[in-house]
């Protein structure tokens, strides 16, 4: 386990378990630690199922490849199924892999995950740099195609944020996927006036929430008056297809900056709305996100 500290912020990272940022805490004026990422007491990261905590990399694509299919309209192949609930591959391979430590200081670390073998053509290198400063955490991502052919790629990060009964989410987007069964896209639609979170409503609805937004402006704000904290999430232009998800009654919410829409690896409607990026051998796809807390 690695620890990073800067000012009032502290993070723990597990390179051996998907390079996960297992916790990010802020020490308040009262000396107490306030969790900025959902991290249940005593929970340890696993590579058996996607971790419902912290924040972690999605690569070489984000979210679902239904039935294990990757098809960008040019190249089609199968990837191993890894979703414990069935139905294909979820979030790629990075979250299940051990990451090498390239460097580590008190407030910064660089990690790398490399895939050089497998039953599918994916061969790549992913680099994740995590930096803390006095006001927040910045995560820089880069994936490089190391295969001998052009292939479709995507990246993303999957933060899990604490959510209370009074938590509000603010996010503006111009469109979203339309889901059929099991989050499989059947089309896309424009959103009037910035979408359902433009007015920063209370997030909790008592039912499952699932959105794959398009045309995001790159900023989301999560405010929880009962804790006195707000979190601002920002992301690069390359990660402007965020997923917002939470099951009914959850004490967390997910806002996942990613480079493509849910199901783009396998679903034509998703691919047409927010496609993967086709990388030539040696070409890279980069992105960044930042999580910044403040008192309210």
List the model feature ranges, each with a label.
Residues 3-5, 75, 80-134:
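Extended, loop-rich substrate-binding clefts of extracytoplasmic carbohydrate-active enzymes
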Residues 254-276:
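A conserved acidic, glycine/proline-rich C-terminal tail/linker
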Residues 224-262:
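Glycine-rich active-site loops that engage anionic ligands at enzyme catalytic sites
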Residues 70-78, 141, 277-294:
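Short Pro-Gly-centered flexible turn/kink motifs
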Residues 4, 11, 15, 113-153, ...:
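Acidic, contiguous internal or C-terminal segments within carbohydrate-active enzymes
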Residues 27-31, 70-75, 102-108, 131-136, ...:
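A short, structured loop/turn motif at beta-sheet edges
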Residues 79, 151-152, 160-236:
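Active-site/ligand-binding surface loops and adjacent short beta/alpha elements
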Residues 10-76, 82:
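Acidic-aromatic substrate-binding/catalytic surfaces of carbohydrate-active enzymes
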């Amino acid at each position: 386990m690695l620890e990073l500290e800067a000012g009032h912020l502290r993070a723990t990272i597990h390179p051996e378990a998907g390079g996960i940022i297992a916790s990010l805490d802020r020490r308040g004026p009262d000396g107490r630690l306030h969790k900025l990422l959902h991290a249940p007491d005593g929970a340890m990261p696993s590579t058996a199922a996607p971790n419902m905590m912290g924040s972690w990399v999605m690569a070489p694509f984000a979210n679902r490849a239904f039935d294990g299919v990757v098809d960008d309209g040019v190249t089609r192949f199968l990837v191993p199924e890894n979703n414990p609930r069935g139905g294909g591959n979820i979030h790629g391979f990075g979250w299940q892999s051990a990451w090498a430590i390239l460097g580590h200081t008190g407030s910064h670390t660089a990690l790398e995950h490399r895939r050089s073998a497998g039953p599918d053509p994916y061969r790549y290198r992913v680099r994740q740099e995590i930096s803390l400063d006095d006001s927040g955490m910045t995560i820089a991502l880069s994936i490089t195609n190391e295969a001998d052919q052009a292939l479709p790629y995507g990246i993303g990060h999957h933060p899990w944020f604490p959510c209370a009964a009074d938590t509000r989410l603010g996010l503006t987007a111009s469109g979203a996927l339309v889901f059929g069964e099991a989050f499989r896209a059947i089309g896309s639609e424009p959103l009037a006036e910035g979408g359902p979170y433009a007015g920063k409503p209370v997030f909790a609805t008592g039912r499952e929430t699932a959105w794959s937004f398009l045309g995001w402006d790159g900023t989301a704000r999560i405010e929880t008056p009962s804790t006195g904290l707000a979190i601002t999430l920002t992301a690069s232009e390359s990660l402007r297809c965020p997923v917002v998800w939470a099951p009914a009654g959850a004490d967390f919410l997910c806002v996942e900056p990613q480079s493509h829409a849910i199901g783009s690896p396998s679903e034509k409607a998703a691919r047409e709305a927010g496609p993967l990026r086709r990388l030539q051998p040696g070409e890279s796809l980069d992105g960044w996100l930042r999580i910044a807390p403040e008192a309210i």
